[in-house]
Design a protein with these regions (language model features):
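Bacterial Sec-dependent N-terminal signal peptides
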Residues: 1-23
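Short coil/turn motif common to extracellular beta-sandwich-like domains
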Residues: 54-62
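Short proline/glycine-enriched turn/loop motifs at strand-loop junctions of beta-rich domains
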Residues: 66-72
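Beta-strand-rich extracellular modules
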Residues: 112-114
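Short, glycine-anchored, charge-dense loop/turn motifs used at functional sites
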Residues: 78-84, 107
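Edge beta-strands of extracellular beta-sandwich domains
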Residues: 117-125
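Short, surface-exposed loop/turn motifs with a glycine/proline- and acidic-biased composition
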Residues: 91-110
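Transition segment at domain starts
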Residues: 19-55
Length: 125
């Protein structure tokens, strides 16, 4: 029983994430994936031992599990946190956004892709 409680406490230390296509075409939850070498090395982020990501097959959004940064591999038009725009950019695949200075709490992130698909997610630091 103590091991179960300790395990659950450990899980609560990590941010939690969920993502959904706001256009209603696709409902997805980001899956926490263990480092599998080739996948992350392909994007030159092999130092991420554990990450949460959304993968539609065409685009990918990866959030480092400690909540310090966002990594995306999709043509991003804009990113906002709690309705505050933090990035407006029409080009640039594979950029990293540092969110380590954010205070602890819950955040809603909206990512608009080049095809104007909007993805809304929640994460907690």
């Amino acid at each position: 029983m103590k091991k179960i409680i300790a395990f659950l406490a450990m899980l609560m230390m990590f941010p939690t994430f969920s993502f959904a296509d706001r256009n209603g075409e696709e409902q997805v939850t980001l899956q926490k994936k263990k480092h599998n070498g080739a996948h992350f090395e392909h994007y030159a982020i092999a130092d991420m031992p554990d990450a949460v990501y959304y993968d539609s097959g065409e685009s990918e959004i990866i959030i480092v599990a400690d909540g310090t940064s966002l990594y995306y591999n999709v043509e991003i038009v804009s990113i906002s946190l709690n309705q505050t725009m933090i990035l407006t950019q029409v080009d640039g695949y594979g950029d990293t956004i540092d969110v380590s200075s954010l205070p602890a709490g819950s955040y809603t992130i909206v990512i608009t892709s080049e095809f104007l698909n909007e993805y809304e997610g929640q994460f907690t630091i």
